Amino acid sequence: MADITDIKAILYTEKTIELQENGVIVVQTSPRMTKNGLKEVFKEYFGVTPSKVNSLRQDGKVKRFRGKIGKRADFKKFYVTLPEGAAIANLSA
């Protein structure tokens, strides 16, 4: 079962702030999170049932540090569309 701890961050960028004005929240999660799991988390913890959830899997970037090659962690990003008129309290940039 999905848990609130699987949500790593709510993303705040220029693009996501524009989307928030249209009722779409962008969430970064662990790679094991599923669409249905995220819907359950939003219903249980935020009291809102999303009308639509889109997801994408993002590979971590390969970076160099002091001559050694490393890789950042992979993550999933979800675009959560809230129903018309629904909002989540204390969720603003």
From Swiss-Prot:
GO terms for molecular function: rRNA binding; structural constituent of ribosome. The keyword Ribosomal protein applies. SUPFAM superfamilies: Ribosomal proteins S24e, L23 and L15e (SSF54189). One of its GO terms (biological process) is translation. Keywords: Ribonucleoprotein, Ribosomal protein, RNA-binding, rRNA-binding. One of its GO terms (cellular component) is ribonucleoprotein complex. Gene3D superfamilies: 3.30.70.330. NCBIfam families: PRK05738.2-2 (NF004362). Belongs to the universal ribosomal protein uL23 family. HAMAP family: Ribosomal_uL23_B. This is Large ribosomal subunit protein uL23. It comes from Aliarcobacter butzleri (strain RM4018). The gene is rplW.
